[in-house]
Design a protein with these regions (language model features):
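Basic, amphipathic alpha-helical segments enriched in Lys/Arg and hydrophobic/aromatic residues
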Residues: 494-515
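Active-site beta-loop-alpha junctions of metal-dependent nucleic acid enzymes
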Residues: 258-280
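Short amphipathic alpha-helical "interface-anchor" segments enriched in bulky aromatics
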Residues: 464-491
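Acidic, metal-coordinating catalytic cores used for nucleic-acid/nucleotide bond scission
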Residues: 288-297, 315-318, 496-499
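Dynamic "connector" segments at or just before major functional cores
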Residues: 1-211, 215-221, 244-256, 263, ...
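An anionic, glycine-rich sequence signature occurring as long contiguous blocks
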Residues: 239, 259, 308-467, 537-597
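Secondary-structure transition/capping motifs at alpha-helix termini
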Residues: 29, 159-165, 182-183, 202-203, ...
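Short, glycine/acidic-rich hinge or "gate" loops at secondary-structure transitions
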Residues: 519-533
Length: 597
């Protein structure tokens, strides 16, 4: 078979790929030399580098149909042709067989499809199947338990991924920089719509209960705009950015996040989150937060924006409405008829007519004409065991202070503070002595064991208690992000990359939380139904085990081998089908010109 003849060709690099161009030589009479002109794109080097297989454009194949019978590769400066067989492969390609780690990514694929994540990604990143690239990087973070992107090429070489073509660290950096705020917000809206739709399909019309909390992500990059020194929750002596998340309590699925400067206190961030949710059209939700986010301003903002809430109020603020309500109900909270058998705490609910300004105007005084009111439910709880533990703990601390004073030993900072709070100092001649002020001790213990939850939505004290207790899920989400996935450092040097990488890490955390939730629910079912085979491994070990389910790659496709025993049970525990041995056709990963999302 005669080797095709090619016109003069040149390779040009774009941000995403190397392209093949034809050109014509023209003569420059002034410089008295020829130069290249009339460039025309005719193909793409599919490897992403200067050397590799060339995919010819359709118009060039129409001009030179003989090229259809050959595979053309660029090696050095030469173009090497290899004849193809009837299946469109060379003999060497037909003989090539490769083993890929595939079970874990197969399971993750099924979980993404079953959840609202898959459709939300397609909505946010529709161009050029970019959602597959984003998803592949997220899988890398989940299975590698590391966000160091330089390790991705080695991982991808041996792993079945949604995007099977090579992605070099520089390409991944460009993907991060292309992820903009608009696409992230589109993802949030689509994700929430999908989650509500799934709840409706199973007859659940309740509002989404979203646990709210924040964490700090440390950074060595001092030049990033949002990196500031603040109260680091990991006690790292490093600048940080703060990351706030909303996590749906029942499914464990994170549906929103926002980053903010590392020196911004928690209580100031909720107002912006409430405004973001209102602007994005995220409705039918109840925010559940801890004491760090409660306050009059945040209650008013929720009411103005029609966002439901369940806030844990601070009990230690002297003269506050919270303390006033506790004092009013103190006797009722000793009545055994007020003790709930399920939560095992005493509980009382009070309805308060809350007055607020729906449309505040700066420097304008609020009046009765401009004010509105809303009925709020203040749920007051008392736990005797917590109160007794606090009492015993305080007595032990007081005893240590008295012992050190008697032995002439120095007090540490906390002990010195306690000395000033509950002891009376007596000076007589040159002698100094201390006595315990019982009134101060009683005042310090007065509000221990009490909790006050306020809501505009949840009128039942028991349901409010359970909804608050379920906010542990957001703590578990942060542990997944920072410990299990190794994302306690961002490892980026510019703000554009930080935006994109934070989103991909959030996506990886979301998928990992689905895995954890599925395994936890399966474990609960096993306790109820002894016929189900118990799975004792944690989520990381389950994915590691499934990652050893191999897939054979051959020319033009893939197939799974036989899967038996424990690994079949692991697929069952995750609620996904076991992959069968039917061949899976290889996708076409040839890239077109790079575009913005």
């Amino acid at each position: 078979m005669k080797t095709p003849q090619l016109p003069p060709l040149i390779i040009k690099k774009s941000p995403s790929a190397f392209y093949v161009y034809t050109y014509k030589n023209k003569w420059d009479p002034e410089k008295k030399r020829s130069y290249r002109a009339s460039f025309k794109k005719v193909g793409t080097v599919t490897s992403g580098e200067k050397e590799g297989r060339i995919r010819w454009d359709d118009h060039f194949l129409a001009e030179r149909p003989e090229l259809r019978d050959f595979i053309c590769e660029r090696k050095g400066k030469d173009y090497v042709f290899t004849p193809m067989n009837e299946g469109g492969f060379t003999l060497s390609q037909a003989m090539e067989v490769k083993q890929l780690h595939a079970g874990a990514t197969w399971a993750l694929d099924q979980l993404v499809v079953q959840s609202p994540i898959g459709e939300a990604l397609k909505t946010a990143f529709p161009q050029r199947r970019d959602y597959l690239k984003v998803l592949s990087i997220a899988y890398f973070i989940i299975l590698n338990q590391d966000n160091n992107i330089s390790k991705y090429p080695t991982f991808a070489e041996a792993t079945r991924l949604p995007w099977g073509a090579p992605l070099h660290p520089s390409s991944i950096g460009r993907i991060f920089r292309k992820i903009k705020k608009q696409q992230i917000e589109k993802y949030f809206s689509a994700l929430q719509e999908g989650l509500i739709e799934q709840k409706r399909e199973v007859g659940d019309d309740d509002k989404l209960t979203l646990a709210l909390d924040s964490t700090s992500i440390s950074s060595y990059a001092n030049k990033l705009p949002n990196v500031e020194r603040g109260r680091n929750k990991d006690e790292d002596n490093l600048p940080q950015i703060n990351l706030l998340m909303l996590v749906e309590s029942k499914s464990g699925l994170p549906i929103f996040y926002r980053t903010y400067d590392g020196n911004v206190p928690d209580v100031q961030t909720v107002r912006r989150v409430i405004a973001d949710n209102s602007r994005l059209g995220i409705q039918n939700v109840v925010l559940v937060s801890d004491r760090g986010y409660s306050g009059t301003k945040n209650i008013n903002d929720c009411l103005r924006n029609k966002v439901g809430f369940l806030f844990n109020m601070k009990c230690g603020i002297s003269g506050s409405l919270t303390q006033e309500l506790i004092d009013e109900e103190r006797l009722n909270l000793q009545d055994l008829n007020r003790r709930d058998w399920y939560t095992q705490v005493f509980q009382v609910t009070k309805k308060i007519n809350w007055i607020y300004e729906p449309s505040p105007v700066k420097n304008q005084k609020s009046t009765k004409k401009t004010q509105e009111s809303e009925e709020l439910y203040w749920h007051i709880y008392f736990d005797r065991q917590i109160a007794e533990n606090a009492r015993q703990g305080l007595f032990e601390r007081i005893d240590r202070v008295r012992e050190k004073i008697a032995n002439g030993k120095a007090l540490d900072e906390n002990e010195q503070t306690l000395l000033e709070e509950v002891f009376e100092k007596h000076e007589q001649d040159d002698a100094v002595s201390y006595s315990i002020d019982n009134k101060k001790v009683d005042q310090k213990l007065r509000y221990k064991g009490y909790r006050v939850l306020v809501s505009d939505e949840i009128s039942d004290a028991g349901k409010a208690w359970c909804a608050y207790q379920e906010r542990w899920i957001v703590e578990d989400t942060f542990k997944t992000l920072k410990s299990r996935l190794g994302c306690s450092r961002n490892r980026v040097s510019d703000n554009e990359s930080l935006t994109g990488k934070t989103f991909v890490q959030f996506l990886a955390t979301s998928i990992a939380m689905i895995v954890r939730t599925r395994l936890r629910k399966y474990s609960e079912e096993c306790k109820k139904n002894t016929a189900l085979p118990m799975v004792y491994d944690g989520d990381c070990r389950v994915l590691d085990s499934l990652n050893n389910v191999m897939q054979t790659k051959f020319c033009g496709g893939y197939y799974f081998g036989e899967i038996a025993g424990k690994r079949r049970k692991l697929f069952e525990a995750l609620g996904v089908p076991v992959p069968d041995a039917e061949p899976e056709k290889e996708q076409d990963y040839d890239d077109e010109k790079e575009t913005e999302f």
